[in-house]
Amino acid sequence: MSDKQKIKFLLGSNTKMGFIPLFDELRDPLNSKRLYILKGGPGSGKSSLMKRVSKVLEDKNHSLEYIHCASDPGSLDAFIDYDAGIAMVDGTAPHIMDPKYPGAYDVIINMADCWDDMTLIQHKNEIIPLSDIISSCHQMATSCISSAAALLDSNMHFSKAYVKHDTVNDFIAKLTKKLEGSKTGKLKKRLLSAVSVGETIFFDETIEVLSKSIYVIPDIWGAASDALLSELHRMASILEIEQILCYCSIRTPDKIDHIIFPSAGITVTTANSFHRLKDKKNIVIPDLMSPIPHIIEEQMSIHLNRANELIDMACEHIKRAKLLHDDLEAFYVNAMDFSKVDSIFNNIIKEIQ
């Protein structure tokens, strides 16, 4: 894989039910060698350490998958190296992970060993309220997301009656034939999008990297994509075809937005106001919906506009949380001895090699 072909996903995001983590997807003790679980506070160098280690592996042309942070897309929450058989993850809140097979498979790397407690204790009265305000910002974002999801779910419910199931079933039958003979493998669960810092993010480049053929479901109401992708997932599961299931980031795990079949080089993806695909070479799946009566469509449009406004509000709350988180990180950065982080890095590289 070349440097430009980076595979990027998320394994958690703010949803209508709060933060839902999918980080157990990283555990594969029977087929991989090691899961490194990083513990420590903000600014303790967890993401930077992962970037340093993954860069060494990337330079060796290893096959890597990067898991980004929904609340700070420039940071890593985890990465997987399929060639070395290792994964590394930030195991702190909100995606707490602990070893299941301590030492034998997973191991804790304690970044707190690299900081000076007394420096942090001196700033206790600043750290505690700042941490609490950040939590409140995320709670407010969740409130907005929950309200937006309720409106989008309502639209999906009212538009279900207008889905052309014959067209859906015909497409699935044709695609299933193309998938026959594809590699069998386990189901992977991922996210490609998230409500993030001041905007929604969508890793459409991952679809481009993993796909030769991209089928697009144009679906602002959600019902057509829900019907098609749910049934396609069911059929692919019966055939035990390797698939990467990507959920709607605010309705995880209730709604599927994209399915990637990596061995076949085929993706079926949903295009809407939250994730648009730019490539004109994509194959649009036509005629999935019957006309919706104007009065119903008018009301659903109001719902969609309000949902967009609420998502924008959630993005602003997350942006505020990120700015405050930067302030919080500064306290920990000042307390860190990064020469100790260098020692941790060197030990990990020795073990991997």
What are these regions, as identified by a protein language model?
Residues 349-353:
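GST-like fold's C-terminal all-alpha helical module
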Residues 2-20, 55-119, 125-126, 236-315:
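Conserved nucleotide-sensing/catalytic segment adjacent to the nucleotide-binding pocket
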Residues 27-28, 78:
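Short secondary-structure boundary/capping segments within folded domains
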Residues 21, 29-33, 41:
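Charged, compositionally biased non-catalytic regions
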Residues 38-39, 49-52, 57, 65-70, ...:
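A cross-family "folded-core" feature that marks the main globular domain of proteins
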Residues 35-54, 203-204, 210-236:
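Glycine-rich phosphate-binding P-loop
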